[in-house]
Amino acid sequence: MAELILALDLPRGADALRLLDELPALRWVKVGPILMTREGPDFVRTLTERGLKVFLDLKWHDIPNTVAGAVTAAREIGAAMATLHTLGGRAMLEGAAVAAGGDLALIGVTVLTSHEASGYARAVGRERVNIPREVERQALVAAEAGLQGVVCSPHEVSLLRRRLGPELQIVVPGIRRRSDPATDQSRVATAKDAVANGATHLVVGRPIIEAANPAAAFEEFMEETQCSGC
């Protein structure tokens, strides 16, 4: 079983709230840079007042003091979970963990799902990269620094679950139905596969938001996330 997080990848808060009115069973939402920049912290408060848990996906990567301050601010506005880049370094991660104080789950971003091996190698200035090993390396750093979990693609879930044990939260974007296009994410899978491999949270956006019937699409994904015997 896993939690389903709806990515509110919409241009305006009003659009997101209209969509949420159609999904009364939803428990988790993801707020990313677009909505946060346009709507601000009050939008997060609006969501929490509706009883929703907010996954603040801003992927912080800055000097330790700045990131610790951002973590404190996220905790104060009621976010339940937030992301930061594992490549920010041990000092940044450890400082963030202290600032979270146990009230905010910190999730380390490893290799973005938009990357495939050759593109990631170019991005980091290497001749070649083994993405699963890179994800594993970054996840180990995150866990050792005191973070509660990591973000990875569906392709690395089983590796991290075996390597890091049952306690680590594994948040997985790139979740699609078999009939859905992958769009700009290159490492994708179905909800059923991700749950079977040990994911704890699944992030779904466009397959629900852009569906002809978002409520029906949401229920379809919910059935797969609750499939403990997958």
Language model segments and positions:
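Conserved, mostly hydrophobic/aromatic
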Residues: 6, 29, 59, 82, ...
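Glycine- and other small-residue-rich loops at beta-strand/loop junctions that grip anionic moieties
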Residues: 8-9, 32-36, 84-85, 149-150, ...
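Glycine-rich phosphate-binding active-site loops on the catalytic face of alpha/beta enzymes
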Residues: 77-89, 176-177, 184-217
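Structural motif
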Residues: 26, 50, 77, 145, ...
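Conserved anion-binding
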Residues: 62, 66-149, 153-158, 163-171, ...
